[in-house]
């Protein structure tokens, strides 16, 4: 019913323009940009893992994206199926790379102590403060639903692709997710509601609100709230053949 593109980094176009920052094309460029931001007195990232009983899940997305950028889809699948154990050195290397960002006080808004305690819904707010508390926020396509009210896509915020390592030859993998629904009873109202969700109208209503991507083939893509969200959708179709979700 719903899809999310996770390999995205959100930023403020004005903040980038004011500081002379360019969109990084590789992971090496991203890290160099982060170092430049620190040198300029800015904080590169807002990271929040808080989510009540599910606290920590945003870190799993970081880990998956890193694994896809350092190893083949086959290796990734072995990890997912547990054929490759979680203490495998390749997994540990990915974890340590994430740690080099999340556990770097200079890189993270509020310092590393704030990472686990900041709610993931509040974490991107630092993009919109004046002065900005952070320059970038890696999160999925749903996150604009939690941006400050009145924020305009393509003006107040935009995104770029979480880039691959230049040193690797793994294409441009895209991490994704989908929402599945299943009835828990056989009442007619339940069945009819699920049928309604299959209609283009139901999807287009959510598309107009922003923060929603649909896999429905027959929707009017002009119903998306902005060109920004159309751009998110393109990543689901233009991703390399080795895309994993």
Where would I find each of the regions flagged by the language model?
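Extracytoplasmic/periplasmic substrate-recognition and gating elements
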Residues: 18-19, 142, 148-214
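Glycine-centered hinge/linker elements that transmit conformational signals in sensory
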Residues: 34-36, 80-116, 162
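Periplasmic solute-binding protein
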Residues: 1-23, 28-31, 42, 48-79, ...
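A local structural motif
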Residues: 19-22, 102-119, 133, 152-156
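Short helix-initiation/N-cap motifs at beta->coil->alpha
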Residues: 27-29, 112-126
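Short, solvent-exposed loop/beta-turn-alpha elements that line the ligand-binding surface or hinge
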Residues: 68-93, 149-151, 164-173
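Conserved small/polar residues in nucleotide/adenosyl-binding loops
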Residues: 235-243
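Short helices/loops that flank or line small-molecule/ion binding pockets
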Residues: 15-16, 34-40, 119-137
């Amino acid at each position: 019913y719903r899809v999310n593109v996770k390999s995205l980094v959100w930023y403020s176009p004005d903040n980038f323009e004011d500081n002379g920052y360019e969109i990084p094309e590789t992971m090496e460029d991203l890290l160099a940009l982060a170092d430049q931001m620190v040198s300029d007195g800015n904080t590169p990232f807002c990271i929040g893992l808080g989510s009540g009983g599910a606290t920590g899940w945003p870190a799993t997305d970081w880990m998956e994206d890193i694994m896809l950028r350092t190893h083949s889809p086959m290796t990734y699948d072995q990890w997912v199926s547990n054929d490759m154990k979680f203490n495998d050195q390749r997994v540990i290397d990915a974890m340590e790379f994430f740690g080099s960002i999340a556990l770097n006080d200079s890189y993270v808004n509020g310092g590393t102590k704030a990472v686990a305690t900041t709610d993931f819904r509040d974490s991107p707010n630092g993009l919109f403060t004046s002065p900005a508390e952070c320059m970038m926020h890696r999160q999925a396509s749903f996150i604009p639903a939690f941006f400050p009210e009145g924020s305009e896509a393509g003006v107040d915020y935009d995104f770029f692709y979480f880039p691959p390592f230049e040193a690797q030859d793994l294409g441009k993998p895209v991490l994704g997710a989908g929402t599945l629904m299943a009835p828990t009873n056989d009442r007619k109202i339940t069945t009819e509601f699920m049928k309604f969700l299959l209609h283009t109208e139901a999807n287009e209503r959510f598309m107009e609100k922003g923060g929603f991507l649909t896999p429905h083939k027959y929707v009017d893509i002009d119903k998306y709230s902005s060109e920004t969200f159309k751009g998110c959708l393109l990543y689901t179709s233009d991703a390399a053949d080795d895309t994993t979700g």
